[in-house]
Every structure is written in structure tokens, then in C-alpha cells.
Amino acid sequence: MIVVLRKKEKGWITMGLFKDNFTLLKKASEPLYKTPKSVQQTIEIMKISECGIFEVASGKYSKTYRFSDVNYATRTENEQESFFQRYCKCLNSFDCTFKITVNNKNKDMELLKKDVMLSYEQDGFDKMRKSYNNIIEEKILEGRQGIEQERYITISIERKNFEEAKAQFTTIENSLFKNFAELGSKLIPISGNERLKILHDYYRLGKEEEFDFDIKEGKKTGTDFRNDICNSKLKFYQDYYEDESKVCRAIYIKKYPTYLSDRFFTELTFLPIHSITSVDVVPVPKDMTMRILQKKYLGIESNIIKQQQTRNKNNDFSSEISYTTRRQKADIEDIMNNVRENDESLFFVGVTMVVMAENIEELDSICESIDSVARGTGCSVDICQYKQREALNTVLPIGVRQIETMRTMLTQSLAVLMPFNVQEICDKSGIYYGVNQISKNIIVGNRKKLLNGNGFIFGVSGAGKSFQAKMEMG
């Protein structure tokens, strides 16, 4: 289990050393409409394109990619350490603002059952089919019902026009695909229609099948995409908001501990609730990082001299300095060494989460569960008071950030917010193979989709190898 410690080689969460934040870097973007007159005006998108590039503000463009989960939780500690270092390398490669999003989206369980269970043929064997279907249904109920997890990374850049932005995204993708391939994760650019569907599925939870907007057709007819993805009602309160089908609350991580387990982010996003969690990251240029670190170091040295002068005036000629100042000096020296020698980078990081429920009582209960998970690791979460709309826009994979609550982290501290957990297999028209031991979701595979569909069935005597082979043969 990888843990971030303040003075260990693996990195540490910087605690209050950068109170004079680089306001320009972490400044939140302004809403397109300060006072929206319609639900459509709450959607922070100016222009869309078929290739998936959205203009979210004047001269600011974003593009979203879906990336697959990999088996991280099942690895040995040494393998996790190696993967962790590769992920750090991936994070260091970013020189633009990005957002990592884990979306616990709605899943049609009836459709899953229909796809996996055997259909009745009334040929005298339906009793056996029913017994088999009962086993599958029992296993489905043990998993995370009604929830399917997807992961996205949204890149945001500033360019003069669409063509320049498109060229820049092409350049970014060259290294992005390579870095994710080294992690074993498949990165897929999301088209404009797919990005709109992700937003539609959030706004119209439970009505996912109603989405039928096409950007190419919309251009011909002059249809506003906002009308097709938004819901009919959106009302914001101090600490929650509601729409036509659900109540939601936006929260954020307010406080981090001195050390943090790499399982924390997984535990937070693995709760069996409909939620969207985003990690907003703003890289700080290396030259600016060293400049501010040196400035801090000189400031601490100056404080030490002043303390000594004050003591000398009081006829106290001890060379001891206060514990707080001594601690600050040691911390800043450790950070400077890591930035110089271990290729650490500095980032502004903010974690925001939107949770959904059918009523306010259920919402409060869910937030208590999240708070319990956070407190168990030494973190604390808080509600985005009077900022529910801004937090919602920040969480969604649009490419805007309207919340300024961020803190500084080094590369390895950021990497501890690990978005990878375990790979799921749920192929369409597949066969039930068992249960994922980590997620408890069923494994449904379709070997016909593989490049080579051959396989072996391993097991001890009596494990059911012959039965499994016969089930595949039908």
C-alpha cells in the first residue's frame, strides 16, 4: 500500500507553505451568464464541433478522452510501486490544465439481465434455465446495482481560434496516447455527440435512451443542442440543488492529512451511489516553481535572523530557533531537493464531487457516508456553500473550473489520488464467467470479439470445468 508521507521519498502533501498562491494560475473562470434566465444558460458551452472540441469561453477550448481502468488493486506492492512511478511520469508530462473525472453513471439493470440471462424456449429445459438465471441474478444483486463507472480526462487550452486549438490537441495527443499505453490503459477521444450524451445522461438521469441529437443534423436544422441535453428544471439552494428527477449536492475536499493512502480516491468513488467526482489540476511551470520556493526559503532565513536579533537584544544568546520555523525550513528544503533531483512538479489541485439522490433525506445519508470515508483517512469534506451551480459546472467534463478552492501538491502527492482500481469485463451479448473479486460485479465476456477467441479453462477437480465448457457451447 503506497502512502504519502511528509518527509519520505514518495512525496508529501505540502501543508500551508504557499499561502501567497499564484492567483493568476488558480483563478476560477467566470460563468457565461452570471444570472441565467433559463436552464439552457446554465450549460457552460459556447460552441461545439463533431470532433469533440468545445469552445467553453472566448479563446478557451476543451476536449475529453475516455480511458479504461486497469488492474491496480490486484497487483503486488512492488508492481504497484512501479505503476505509481509510471503514473507520476504521465502527470509530469502535462503542461496544460486538465481534469480527471470518475463518473458513476446510471446503468439499466433490466437491459443487463436481458443480455446475460438465458431466454426461455419452452422445450422442456426451462427449469434448468431458470435455475441458472437465478444464480446470475443473485450475483448481479451482490454487485453495485444500477451503476456503471466511466473515467475521463478533459484537457483545456487557450488559443486564438478553433484551427490552432485543433492543431494543439493533436500535438498533446501524441504524448498522451503513449503515456496511457505505458500504464496499460486505453485512451479514446470522445466525439462531440458522445460528449453531449455524457452531459445528457447526467441532466436526464434515468432517461438515457431519449438522447438522439446529432451535431451534423443540428447544423442543418439550426437546432440548439442545449434544448436536447438539459432538463426542464434546475433550482439552486445554499447547500444543494434540485432538478426534475433528483436532488444533488456539490462537496469538495477541504483538508488533507499529513499522509494519505492510495486507496482513498478509490474508496471515495467506489461508493454505490450516483456521483461525479473530478480532480482539477493546474500545472505550475518549473521556473515559477523554483522562483517561489527560493522566495519562501529566503523568507524563512530572514525570519531566523530576525528571531536571533530579537533574542540578542533580550540578552538571550542561544542559537536555537523556534520549532515552527525549523519545521518550515526543513519542509522547504525537502521540496526543493525533490523538485531538483527527483523530477517533481508542482500543481494546484482541487477535488470536487456531486452526489445525487431521490430526496433530501437520502442525500443527507449519502453525504454522511462520504464524510465517514473521508474522516477515516484524515481528510475532511465540506459543502460548496452558495456555490452549487459553480461546483456543478466544475465537476462536469466540460472543461471549466469555477471553484477556486485548490491547494498545492507535488507530483507524487497528486498521484496518490489514483483513478485506477480494477478492470471490469462486461461485453455485449457475452457469457457469464463469474464475479470480479474486487468490485463484486459480474464478469460477462464475449470471446467472439477477441482477435483470437481460443481459451483454456483451469480449475481443481470438481471446480466445474466441464460444466463451464458445456455452458459456452450452449
Task: Tell me the role of every PLM-derived stretch.
Residues 51-54, 70, 77, 84-91, ...:
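Glycine-rich phosphate-binding loop of nucleotide-binding enzymes
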Residues 406-435, 439:
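Pre-P-loop entry segment of helicase/translocase ATPase cores
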Residues 2-6, 11-419:
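Extended, folded cores of ATP/NTP-driven motor/assembly subunits in large transport
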